[in-house]
UniProtKB/Swiss-Prot annotation:
Gene source species: Sorangium cellulosum (strain So ce56)
Function: ATP-dependent carboxylate-amine ligase which exhibits weak glutamate--cysteine ligase activity.
Protein name: Putative glutamate--cysteine ligase 2
EC number: 6.3.2.2
Keywords: ATP-binding, Ligase, Nucleotide-binding
Length: 375
């Protein structure tokens, strides 16, 4: 099998999970409403079991099936967002896609009843209760666990670039936080988060997981919440670093970018040209810059040992993945990444709306509108 055939042999499939805010149409506050939303009212069958509660009752998560390419993924995302929007409107609610709500207080949100969430809250207390954040997770199918581990090691370098493109959480509890991705800093309070360290093999990773289970730290590897991980139950590498993207087109673009990066790294792996693996501490420096400044900052090019504007580095990244994007047929979706570089992210738009109106309600109204574009 050639390296290109390996990309197309039922691998590098896509699965996309989106976490949405449930917002009261009148108050624009988050509403603890997910149980009512999903209990089976008219139109519920459109979601076909692909939506579920999260820890807070004001959060609803949707997930595509296993998609063979980005076009199938887009079709499923349109259907899921559209169905969710329709259901929410019937109950006087609206759906918002963003990494944090601009002003709602976590202390006013109900926790979903369930053994898993009870255990998390019992263990983490207010760290868990305050974790009122919303993310985008992209799964890329990789059958061989050793290959998956190698790709998870190597893709870490590009995670700050991807985060910068996704930033959508500039507000927290009714204040500008000064960060483009407030969500990232809130989630840091959880254990077992952030950029993971390097693992020599999948066996090395599994021994780490086994030790945590044996010592009572976790009951299974799903409680390892790193920015990228080999999924414990699926044959995928899961990229978890993104803020929830507001526009559907941006979700599609970032999913295509994640797939293309994984594909390019696989091609290098098959050619014995593996990408250099950098230390966790170095990549965390770049992650902080993406959290703070988004696309307006500079990341460190560790090869050149100098700071480079994020927009320039993302442009280089798009050139780097051109080969795999052509194989996957995702060049059109990646053109949207260039538009994000030009137009800015959801965080930039939210800040502009607030600067113009001085109204968090206006920010939420704009988010509601932007979250339904393309449906």
């Amino acid at each position: 099998m050639t390296d290109v055939e390996g990309l197309l042999d039922g691998q590098f499939t896509l699965g996309i999970e989106e976490e949405f805010q449930i917002v009261d149409a009148e108050t624009r506050e988050l509403r603890s409403y997910v149980s009512q939303l999903l209990e089976g009212g008219p139109g519920h069958e459109l979601l076909r079991g692909r939506a579920r509660p999260e820890m807070h009752q004001s959060v609803v998560e949707t997930g595509t099936g296993v998609c063979r390419d980005i076009r199938q993924a887009r079709g499923e995302l349109v259907e899921l967002r559209g169905s969710l929007n329709a259901l929410a409107r019937r109950g006087g609610m609206r759906i918002v896609a963003a990494g944090t709500h601009p002003f709602s207080d976590w202390k006013k949100q109900d926790i979903t009843d369930g053994e898993r969430y009870r255990c998390i809250v019992e263990d983490l207390q207010d760290v868990a209760r305050a974790n009122l954040i919303f993310g985008l997770h992209v799964h890329v199918g990789v059958k061989d666990r050793e290959v998956a581990m190698a790709l998870a090691n190597q893709v870490r370098y590009f995670l700050p670039h991807i985060l910068a493109l996704s930033t959508s959480s500039p507000f927290w509890l009714g204040r500008p936080s000064g960060l483009k991705s407030t969500r990232s800093e809130i989630f840091k309070r959880f254990p077992r988060t952030g950029i993971p360290g390097l693992f020599e093999s999948h066996g090395h990773f599994q021994r780490f997981v086994d030790l945590l289970v044996k010592t009572g730290c976790i009951d299974n590897a799903k409680k390892i919440w790193w920015d990228v991980r080999p999924h414990p139950f699926f044959d995928t590498v899961e990229v978890r670093i993104c803020d929830m993207t507001t526009r559907l087109d941006d979700t599609v673009a970032l999913a295509a970018l994640v797939q293309a990066v994984m594909g390019k790294l696989y091609l290098l792996y098959r050619r014995n040209l593996g990408f250099r693996e950098y230390r966790q501490e170095l990549i965390e420096e770049n992650k902080w810059r993406a959290v703070r400044y988004g696309l307006d900052g500079q990341l460190i090019d560790f090869g050149k040992q100098e700071q480079v504007p994020v927009r320039h580095l993302v442009g280089e990244l798009l050139e780097f993945v051109q080969e795999s994007a052509e194989i996957f047929g995702s060049q059109r979706e990646l053109e949207r990444v260039r538009r994000i570089l030009h137009e800015g992210t959801s965080a930039d738009r939210q800040l502009a709306v607030y600067a113009r109106t001085k109204s968090f309600h206006a920010v939420v109204d704009d988010l509601i509108e932007q979250s339904s574009l393309g449906l």
